[in-house]
Regions:
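Short, solvent-exposed amphipathic alpha-helical segments in soluble enzyme
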Residues: 8, 24, 154-155
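Amide-donor transfer/coupling interface in amidating biosynthetic enzymes
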Residues: 74-155
Length: 155
């Protein structure tokens, strides 16, 4: 049996365009859920976070099962553009990035621990959260790693 990788990075994308295909990929979904449950380190940004949710709902409200690592749903219902530069303060470090999405998380506050502080470019509190469940970190912000080591997020 292959050893677990040291890190799984699920960047953004547009999972809402591939809901049927992602839902049908049961083996991939269960492998990712098992990896996370075994303590694997996962960083999921935007579409990657949506994929880790219990389900993604399309614009009409139809739910498609996803990985179920996070106990929440992403929804495209009532789409609204959210964007801007972000600063994430976590573990004594500051990370920079940006947020660009039309989906939302429901409910926003769930059983996962929310960590860090996210600010706008004007140092105002950003309305989105960074979720942590074990070694899984997931949020809407696409991080810029030229200034900080992504592995430091897990220390």
């Amino acid at each position: 049996h292959d050893a677990l990788p040291i890190f799984l990075y699920l960047p953004g994308g547009y999972p809402e365009f591939y809901l049927s295909e992602l839902a049908a990929a049961e083996r991939s979904r269960s492998s990712i859920a098992a990896y996370a449950a075994a303590g694997g380190r996962v960083l999921a940004e935007c579409g990657g976070m949506m994929y880790l949710c219990r389900a993604i709902r399309d614009e009409e409200g139809k739910a498609y099962p996803m990985c179920g690592v996070l106990d929440q749903e992403a929804t495209m219902e009532g789409m609204r553009l959210r964007l801007g530069y972000r600063k994430l303060r976590l573990g004594g470090r500051e990370y920079r990035g940006h947020e660009f999405h039309y989906s939302s998380i429901v409910p926003q506050e769930v059983s996962e621990e929310t960590v860090g502080e996210q600010l706008t470019a004007r140092d105002e509190v950003a309305p989105t959260l960074l979720y942590r469940r074990g070694n899984v970190l997931a949020g809407y912000t696409h991080l810029y790693f030229a200034e900080q080591d992504p592995f430091a997020l897990f220390s």
